């Protein structure tokens, strides 16, 4: 369960801006802090290249 950043991430920073928990940083590509992430999926909605996948399986 969680957010997965795919290899095609270009580090645009949209996910960082829109994450309500401030759980994402960019260091060339996006990195998710799983301790802060609530798995809401807002970051994925704002990714212009669909490089973020939300795993909702239990």
From Swiss-Prot:
Q: How is the cofactor bound?
A: Binds 2 [4Fe-4S] clusters.
Signal sequence residues: none
One annotated GO molecular function: metal ion binding
Limits of the 4Fe-4S ferredoxin-type domain: 2-27, 28-57
UniProt cofactor(s) = [4Fe-4S] cluster
Keyword check for 4Fe-4S, yes or no: yes
Q: Which residues bind [4Fe-4S] cluster 2?
A: 19, 37, 40, 43
Q: Which InterPro entries match?
A: 4Fe4S_Fe-S-bd, 4Fe4S_Fe_S_CS, Fe-S_Ferredoxin
What keywords does the record list, in alphabetical order?
Answer: 4Fe-4S, Electron transport, Iron, Iron-sulfur, Metal-binding, Repeat, Transport
Chain sites annotated for binding [4Fe-4S] cluster 1 = 9, 12, 15, 47
| Taxonomic superkingdom | Archaea
Q: What does this protein do?
A: Ferredoxins are iron-sulfur proteins that transfer electrons probably in the CO-dehydrogenase complex.
This protein is called Uncharacterized ferredoxin MJ0624
